[in-house]
């Protein structure tokens, strides 16, 4: 089911369309999983973030009404623009830029809107009211939203209107860089949309899990050809795959059920290029008690950027930046997956409401990262 609300008539067809399918950055992939479709009974949002600034950090922010944990660019020291997060009321949001909604450009203030929403919203209805009343911001995005009341929906929104698509009970939805309500055959991310469609069709028997999306973040199948880039050892053009040279992070946000405390949400955050980095846990209830590897200067992100350059040997060359050294990434992936398996195991044994346990997890997380760094760089 979807609902369209337009506050003003849209302008004529675009004179300028920026960053379409061949774009170098700002081309994310997202999915929403309803509570009944997940392996944990919690609703989830997944976001593979692509950006020109590939350095991210986690931070816990005190909003106008609610505190929240979110992803920020390392240059955003004031934490004004989040690219995905969850608050203490169980409200979570992430986005894809959409390139077929606005008539002239892409809308550059989506991060400001998401920070504002995380600070004041408890429900999908709160967020919808924000959009209906007008935000005063230049936006153009597919906003993935879940709440603690069982709500889950995409809002395909721009400055002067939005269309809401509710996730079917027991179902899933996903988006790339075009909106279903936008201008037909415009926008970007069509190859990735085909790829994530094929991935999501293979629904696991026990439901979608964080591990499912961590695998998706490192899935090298081309959406149009179906070809798996990892089958060979040559250089391959990877700009239209889910993991792109501009992939800056991946995150799985686990929301809460109506039987849980609203601040029971958590995030599995992969800093930097996902094939060269692994997921680390952060709990909303833990506040600013975050792992040092992914907050502040985020050394795990810095390492992932270094490794991304290693597997893209011509990255500094404009023509060569989007060519992946398959042989090199295949050497790194097993080390990443082994480290991630251990990290998930340790996190799941940690009580996110217990400050001492979280502190212990964070300290051990640093030690595990140092061991990973030694293995992956030698």
PLM regions with names:
Residues 1-6:
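N-terminal secretory signal peptides that target proteins for export/translocation
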Residues 10-21:
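Bacterial N-terminal signal peptides
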Residues 20-21, 137, 158-161:
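Hydrophobic alpha-helical segments
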Residues 27-85, 89-119, 141, 147-378:
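C-terminal, well-structured catalytic/ligand-binding subdomain of enzymes
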Residues 123-126:
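Alpha-helix N-cap recognition
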Residues 129-144:
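Secretory/export targeting leaders with adjacent low-complexity proregions
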